[in-house]
Swiss-Prot record:
Residue runs in coiled coils: none
Source organism of this protein record: Rhodopseudomonas palustris (strain BisB5)
Gene Ontology CC annotations of this record: cytoplasm; ribosome
UniProt-recorded name of the protein: Ribosome maturation factor RimM
Domain PRC barrel, residue spans: 93-170
PANTHER family membership: RIBOSOME MATURATION FACTOR RIMM
Subcellular location: Cytoplasm
Broad class of the protein's primary localization: cytoplasm
Assembly, per entry: Binds ribosomal protein uS19.
Pfam families for the chain: PRC_RimM, RimM
GO molecular function: ribosome binding
Summary of the function given for this chain in its UniProt record: An accessory protein needed during the final step in the assembly of 30S ribosomal subunit, possibly for assembly of the head region. Essential for efficient processing of 16S rRNA. May be needed both before and after RbfA during the maturation of 16S rRNA. It has affinity for free ribosomal 30S subunits but not for 70S ribosomes.
Gene: rimM
Keyword field: Chaperone, Cytoplasm, Ribosome biogenesis, rRNA processing
Amino acid sequence: MPAGLICIARIGAPHGVRGAMRLWSFTAEPLAVMDYGPLATKDGARSFEIATARPAKDHLVVTLKGVATREEAERLNGLELYVPRDRLPPTEDGEYYHADLIGLPAITPAGEPLGRVLAIHNFGAGDIIEIAPPQGATLLLPFTNAVVPTVDLTAGHVVIELPTEIEGDTPNHPEA
């Protein structure tokens, strides 16, 4: 991702036949996505201006200037939209943007290295932090205060308290 860009929204499926579409806003107040001017694709090749927006169940329904048909809206499904960081308000103490965490070392409360923050996901049930250990599969953990008790941007790390029980596949043992 180009330096200084923050993803603030993702376009979803069309809504109706006149070019409206679902939009998932990643701003604290969903309608604030309209306050940051034109939104661009990650590579900066395309730029979009929100013409109208209204809240829906867990997303916004928006129209974009220049998008007038369902077919045009369908072609945009899944696009992430970015703004330069300097258009966003500064963070307050204890606040951060998800982009600030990507690449930070993840350590245990004892200071032992676990890996690096690879991504923050949200599949609908809350934020998930993805940790890439030095070897092996990535860890997908709930981004909660219990699992991530400390985000220290000054020290440049996150503290991860690994859950004592992690559900997963267990080997089948035939009964003897």
